[in-house]
UniProtKB/Swiss-Prot annotation:
Family: Belongs to the peptidase M54 family.
A Pfam family of this chain: Peptidase_M54
Residues binding Zn(2+) 1: 130, 134, 140
InterPro entries: MetalloPept_cat_dom_sf, Pept_M54_archaemetzincn, Pept_M54_archaemetzncn_arc/bac
Its job: Probable zinc metalloprotease whose natural substrate is unknown.
Annotated organism of origin: Halobacterium salinarum (strain ATCC 700922 / JCM 11081 / NRC-1) (Halobacterium halobium)
Encoding gene, per UniProt annotation: amzA
Sample GO molecular function, one term: zinc ion binding
Subunit: Monomer.
Cofactor: Zn(2+)
EC number: 3.4.-.-
Catalytic class of the enzyme: hydrolase
Active site: 131
Protein name: Archaemetzincin
């Protein structure tokens, strides 16, 4: 399986490296980092000062031909009535998106004795695994350590692991 990572907007190189490394490690897949795509201006909702997540998926999937496509963006995303989302994917679909905007440690109000860059990198790794998992047919998992566990806040993201639990692994592999 080939997974294309599509930066939408200015995504730092280390974020692309973390995402690539995590996807290769967990899913044993080929990963290609595609060229940066422009932010879809029509996706911006002025009243919310946020972007519609689904349009980032559309932008990324149009730009590549991989088996799966994951858009990564530094912009704040929302979906339907949710205040924000870390990412969005369509179950068994081809594309998904991860926003790093709310994965920054300055946004969480939490605490950790680890460096903020390490915490951020871990969050990125977990969320790309999570969103790609949805495109592979995985739904949210009840195991709070599994990468597929629903994580509405960064505290839940921090609690889970980068890897899939045994049950989710059996479903995918």
């Amino acid at each position: 399986m080939r997974v294309d990572i599509v930066p939408v907007g200015d995504v730092p190189a280390h974020v692309k490296r973390q995402a690539s490394s995590s996807l290769r490690s967990v899913y044993d897949c080929e990963v290609v980092v595609a060229s940066e795509q422009d932010v879809p201006t029509a996706a911006y909702d002025e009243a919310r000062s946020q972007y519609r997540a689904a349009e980032f998926i559309d932008t990324a999937t149009r730009a590549t031909s991989g088996d799966k496509t994951i858009a990564i963006t530094p912009h704040d995303l929302f979906y339907r009535r949710r205040n924000y989302v870390f990412g969005l994917a369509y179950l068994d679909g081809r594309g998904c998106v991860v926003s790093t905007y709310r994965l920054q440690t300055s946004s969480d109000g939490g605490f950790s004795n680890r460096s903020s860059s390490d915490v951020f990198d871990d969050r990125v790794r977990k969320e790309v695994v999570h969103e790609l998992g949805h495109t592979l047919g995985l739904e949210h998992c009840d195991n709070n350590r599994c990468a597929m566990n629903f994580s509405p806040t960064v505290r839940e993201v921090d609690r889970k692991e980068e890897n899939l639990c045994g049950s989710c692994q059996r479903t995918v592999f």
